[in-house]
Amino acid sequence: MALKYQRILLKISGEALGGEKGTGFDEPTMDAICGGVKKAHELGVQIGIVVGGGNFWRGRSSGKMERTLADQIGMLATVMNALAVSDKLEQLGVPTEVFTSITMPQVAPAFTRKEALHAMEEGKIAIFGGGTGNPFFSTDTTTALRAVEVSADIMFKATMVDGVYDKDPHKYPDAKKYETLTFTKVLEDRLAVMDGTAATLCRDNKLPILVFDLADPDNIARAVQGENVGTLVYEG
């Protein structure tokens, strides 16, 4: 099957790397997720990845800590995850390059659009750590920003549910799944796709989002080929 997308930006939550517990690194889960990324990469698609940091740090659970400091700790957690995902992919024979939004030359080069594009065009998976480099912005917003910067065709948001619902499907058996959505409806109805900043950035730059379940890592390759594996959000 031909590729529907030539360049994608994939968001993976930090909790996903922690398996059922959602903390630290769960090796079988890491193997499965990175194996799914490898299958997509072997199809010839250019891939960028943003990883969250929730398996190590949740800013909203930081108690009385000052928000800027809490977010900076979260940014460092995403760098740890970026390095871990890079290492796992390299073990599987997939070339990668990590970029950070926070200057730490002993760890990885700082992000620039030119270098990230060069890496992807060479067949490497570009992995972005450090969030946007600024507090008060989510990793969803980071993914949207990097996707726009590298001219990705689409943003893939790999989650723990198989798409977007009108209410929490884990709590409400009658929850309705959307096959497609517009950004306008997402923003007006405050649907749990991503935060408003990220959704607005995607809408304004005509960047579609595909939300799908990472429980089956093969969904990444299926999505690249245009299979219906989740909910497509676009600006109609």
Residue ranges and their predicted role:
Residues 1-236:
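C-terminal catalytic "cap/lid" subdomain
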